[in-house]
Curated annotation (Swiss-Prot):
Domain YcgL: 4-88
HAMAP family named among the record's database cross-references: UPF0745
Coiled coil spans: none
Protein name in the entry: YcgL domain-containing protein Csal_1462
The species this protein was found in: Chromohalobacter salexigens (strain ATCC BAA-138 / DSM 3043 / CIP 106854 / NCIMB 13768 / 1H11)
Amino acid sequence: MTRRLCEIFKSPRRDEMYLYVDRARGLADMPEALLERFGKPVPVTVLMLSEDKPLARAKASDVLAAIEAQGFYLQMPPARESYLLDLYRAPTEGRY
């Protein structure tokens, strides 16, 4: 079973966007383009991650594999529900 001490950061630019990195390596190996879009990482927590650890929106095995391969795992925000997007597209003229 693979286990890794991970540090999790949230993005100040987008709600519900998180960056998982190896605690030992930190942010030193992050691509500049990623950090530019992500913003200044805000530390959230440190977590001992193993393949059987349940996560809310990702499989722990996928997170561990991505950290091993590229040094990080980027968790994107969930897709917005289409009915919520329609509220912004609907014309508002004549409603008030």
